[in-house]
Amino acid sequence: MIDDTYNSSPAAAAAALQTLYSFDDAAERIVVLGDMCELGASSQMEHEKLGSMCDPNLLAWVVTVGPESERYIAPAARRRGCQVHIARNAIEAGEFVRSVTQGNAIVLVKGSQDTIYLEECVKVLCNMTEDVRLVRQDAQWMAKKEAFFQQFK
């Protein structure tokens, strides 16, 4: 597991994806990509560019979370020939990845913080009971996330 859920930018996401590709001993590689926020007018271009970096020869799955990722990363990755799953939220993404992961998989989880909350995907994948090591776990963040995830119930 590569937990890079604190925040994201085009350069950081590209570097994280290249790091995932560098693991030679992985039976499979899965990437969970969330929106990169605060990109303004360049959002479409940057999300599409990241999607086009997804290599079907190196990735078993591309999982997206967030509206920009659904609109731009997912189609670009599909055009490259990748298997893509669009998740409604981070928890659903974690459940999906857990259902398709086999044996020696390496999973990269990368996205911006606001309304993406990919640390919750990591929590699902790791079956974590003690989550103090994850980002955004204090009472204020947990209340904000609880309110956010209510829309999916």
What are these model-predicted stretches?
Residues 1-153:
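ATP-dependent carboxylate-amine ligase
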